């Protein structure tokens, strides 16, 4: 069956979107191709309205191993749960789609992105959002797109649209931007400390480049798009009471209740105002129909609270905890609260508190990253934990949520930019952010706590990093940017803009817009205000730890790096691994690389040093003429074996022991005796002949050892018939 294909150029390569050939029973279906990367993207919504009071949208990103010609490595040889990369890719798509569904839309909607082919150069994570935008645009699902998404890199000072995997390794930034025709909706960035102005320029560049994709999707919608189905919005008559409820709330003290500093106390006071107002409308909560009426009134009252909070911010520059728009909450920091951890710190900002813990390990602890676009070992891990007690709630605890994975990834990108290279600091690093209290910006507090824990552990980071979450309240042309937002401001505001960086520039950024998008001018103002807040936080961190501790934590393991001749690796390994097992039995882990780099890892510094000395002995290349203070380790009728250094013995012939003729070696030497010896010769098998330097010239030198086999034995006698 022949479908209809639409094409445009993006980043110098053709992007094609086809519809009408695959998955035709679904509401919206497209097949997208870019290079040899292909995706099938579908969109479907239920006909009946969901009883949920939020948008029931799910986005699934399905990686298929056949896309790169692989068979899954699982026991059943089939794909399992989505990996971290797939979850992050799904979140990128979700964040650009969600704000554009109409208000009151409550139909369960599912977008599924299936990677059919991956060329490992053109990443599917930024193609999925384009496919989702196209599938929704041509479907019968109400949605306010289209949107487009591109990645921007910067190589040699030039911006590149959708850089290949090879180009991305040389890029100063990895920026993903999604937007509509007129505005930016979502930004995700990791960078090697770039300026705020460079970021804004890159975002503007991305927005201009995505216009061709938006043109293409609009053309698709005009030619093959379906009529959108009608849905029933909230339509509750109680919503008409919002102005009346607002008057009653103001009379009941809503302003003072909202401006209460502490979260629990504020919740209690606003609840008391709400309940008093509702009681005036429903005096008997047990009456028939009262429960539904109360629920509807609560929903309407929530709008009143939102309106009042936004009014206070815009008109009076007052926030829920009494701060103005630019203020950062009070900060309290403690370094090394955990006595046995390699590095630890507590970072508290207002009612958000995170315990950061750093653990140092060896290459054996690195994690294998094996997805459709990457096969590598990651030597830096950051795990973000968000238990229910952090918000004073009771919830089921299970595996990591998508939110935890996303927040951890952002913090990881922020910190990775300042880590030393593995050659400079040969440790695998695991950071854990334990969120103990959460009232906004817990991921940014994780960045601060994590960096402090690294410095406490003695990790030589390039510079401290801090993070701050920015917010926005916008009504028409009037807006106010907020620094260090509360959870309440995140829920009721129009933007969540997280910015991380050093004093010199930005290392990571994440922006989600809940309105139709923001202009570059608002973005510049938000970045400038974020820098102001970030520098304030860095100053508070410096009061406790301004730089990494000069020495590793006493509880941290020690790693000693040794470089040997690669031809001597066999000596360290030994026959069947015998030698390396003996080394590890001394209390250390030993890793050996093909280039001759050996790393000795031990929690016991003395054990690590002993193993290093043993390896140095095993790999030392003895030379004729060198003298050693040796120890007799064995005697034989023909001479004594003398240990020169770890792993290397030489033989002192009986004729070279004394000026006098000896009938037995034991007449002059016994096991354990120490003596000065000199290397007289080394045969082709590495066997060492020794002499005593003080007797040199006084006794006749011994003839060199004859080679064992392989010499010239003369001609073979004639064969007898």
From Swiss-Prot:
One of its GO terms (cellular component) is cytosol. Pfam families: KH_1 (PF00013), PNPase (PF03726), RNase_PH (PF01138), RNase_PH_C (PF03725), S1 (PF00575). One of its GO terms (molecular function) is RNA binding. SUPFAM superfamilies: Eukaryotic type KH-domain (KH-domain type I) (SSF54791), Nucleic acid-binding proteins (SSF50249), Ribonuclease PH domain 2-like (SSF55666), Ribosomal protein S5 domain 2-like (SSF54211). InterPro entries: ExoRNase_PH_dom1, ExoRNase_PH_dom2, ExoRNase_PH_dom2_sf, KH_dom, KH_dom_type_1, KH_dom_type_1_sf, NA-bd_OB-fold, PNPase. It comes from the Bacteria. Its EC number is 2.7.7.8. It catalyses: RNA(n+1) + phosphate = RNA(n) + a ribonucleoside 5'-diphosphate. PROSITE patterns: KH_TYPE_1 (PS50084), S1 (PS50126). Its cofactor is Mg(2+). Residues 625-693 form the S1 motif domain. It is found in: Cytoplasm. Residues 557-623 form the KH domain. Disulfide bonds: none annotated. Residues 693-721 are annotated as: Disordered. Its main location: cytoplasm. CDD domains: KH-I_PNPase, RNase_PH_PNPase_1, RNase_PH_PNPase_2, S1_PNPase. Signal peptide: none annotated. One of its GO terms (biological process) is RNA processing. Keywords: Cytoplasm, Magnesium, Metal-binding, Nucleotidyltransferase, RNA-binding, Transferase. The keyword Nucleotidyltransferase applies. Mg(2+) binds at residues 490, 496. Involved in mRNA degradation. Catalyzes the phosphorolysis of single-stranded polyribonucleotides processively in the 3'- to 5'-direction. Belongs to the polyribonucleotide nucleotidyltransferase family. This is Polyribonucleotide nucleotidyltransferase.
């Amino acid at each position: 069956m022949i479908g209809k294909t639409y094409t445009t150029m993006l980043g110098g390569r053709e992007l094609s979107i086809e519809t009408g050939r695959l998955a035709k029973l679904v509401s919206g279906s497209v097949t997208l191709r870019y290079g040899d990367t292909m995706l099938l993207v579908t969109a479907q919504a239920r006909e009946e309205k969901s009883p949920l009071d939020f948008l029931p949208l799910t986005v699934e990103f399905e990686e298929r191993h056949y896309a790169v010609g692989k068979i899954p490595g699982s026991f059943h040889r089939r794909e399992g749960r989505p990996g971290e990369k797939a979850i992050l890719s799904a979140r990128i798509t979700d964040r650009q789609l969600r704000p554009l569904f109409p208000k009151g839309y409550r139909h369960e909607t599912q977008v599924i992105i299936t990677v059919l082919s991956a060329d490992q150069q053109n990443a599917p994570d930024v193609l999925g959002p384009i496919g989702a935008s196209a599938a929704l645009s041509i479907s019968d699902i109400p949605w306010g797109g289209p949107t487009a998404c591109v990645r921007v890199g910067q190589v040699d000072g030039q911006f590149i649209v959708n850089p290949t995997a090879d180009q991305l390794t040389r890029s100063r930034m990895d920026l993903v931007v999604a937007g509509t025709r007129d505005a930016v909706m979502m930004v995700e960035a990791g960078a090697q400390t770039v300026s705020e102005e460079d970021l804004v320029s890159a975002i503007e560049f991305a927005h201009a480049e995505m216009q061709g994709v938006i043109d293409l999707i609009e053309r698709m919608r005009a030619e093959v798009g379906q009529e959108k189905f009608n849905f029933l919005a909230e339509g509750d008559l109680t919503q008409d009471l919002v102005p009346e409820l607002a008057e009653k709330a103001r009379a009941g003290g809503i302003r003072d209740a909202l401006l209460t500093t502490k979260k629990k106390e504020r919740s209690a006071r606003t609840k008391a105002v709400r309940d008093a107002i509702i009681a005036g409308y429903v005096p008997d909560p047990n009456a028939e129909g009262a429960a539904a009426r109360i629920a509807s009134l609560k929903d309407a009252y929530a709008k009143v609270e939102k309106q009042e909070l936004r009014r206070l911010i815009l008109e009076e520059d007052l926030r829920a905890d009494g701060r103005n728009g630019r203020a950062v909450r009070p900060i309290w920091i403690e370094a090394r609260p955990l006595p046995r951890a390699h590095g630890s710190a507590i970072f508290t900002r207002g009612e958000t508190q995170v315990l950061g813990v750093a653990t140092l390990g060896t290459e054996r602890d690195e994690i294998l990253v094996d997805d459709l676009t990457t096969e590598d070992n990651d030597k830096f891990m950051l795990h973000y934990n968000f238990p229910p007690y952090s918000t004073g709630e009771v919830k089921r605890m299970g595996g990591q949520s998508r939110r935890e994975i996303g927040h951890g990834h952002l913090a990881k990108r922020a910190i990775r930019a300042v880590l030393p290279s593995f050659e400079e600091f040969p440790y695998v690093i695991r950071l854990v952010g334990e969120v103990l209290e959460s009232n906004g910006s817990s991921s940014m507090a994780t960045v601060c706590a994590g960096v402090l824990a690294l410095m406490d552990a003695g990790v030589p980071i390039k510079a401290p990093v801090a993070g701050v979450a920015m917010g926005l309240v916008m009504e028409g042309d009037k807006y106010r940017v907020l620094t260090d937002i509360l959870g309440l401001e995140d829920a009721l505001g129009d933007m969540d803009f997280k910015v991380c960086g050093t004093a010199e520039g930005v290392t990571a950024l994440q922006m989600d817009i809940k309105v139709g998008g923001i202009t570059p001018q608002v973005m510049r103002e938000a970045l400038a205000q974020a820098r102001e807040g970030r520098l304030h936080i860095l100053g508070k961190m410096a009061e406790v730890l301004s730089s990494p501790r000069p020495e590793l934590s006493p509880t941290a393991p020690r790693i000693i790096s040794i470089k040997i001749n690669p031809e001597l690796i066999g000596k360290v390994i030994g026959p069947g691994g015998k030698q390396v097992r003996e080394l590890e039995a001394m209390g250390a882990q030993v890793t050996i690389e093909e280039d001759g780099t050996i790393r000795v890892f031990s929690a016991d510094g003395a054990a690590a040093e002993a193993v290093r000395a043993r390896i140095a002995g095993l790999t030392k290349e003895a030379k004729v003429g060198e003298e050693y203070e040796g120890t007799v380790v064995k005697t034989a009728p023909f001479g004594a074996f003398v240990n020169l250094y770890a792993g290397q013995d030489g033989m002192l012939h009986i004729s070279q022991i004394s000026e006098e003729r000896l009938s037995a070696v034991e007449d002059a030497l016994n096991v354990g005796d120490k003596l000065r010896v000199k290397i007289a010769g080394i045969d082709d098998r590495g066997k060492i002949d020794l002499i005593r330097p003080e007797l040199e010239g006084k006794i006749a030198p011994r003839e060199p050892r004859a080679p064992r086999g392989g010499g010239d034995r003369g001609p073979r006698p004639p064969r007898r018939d």
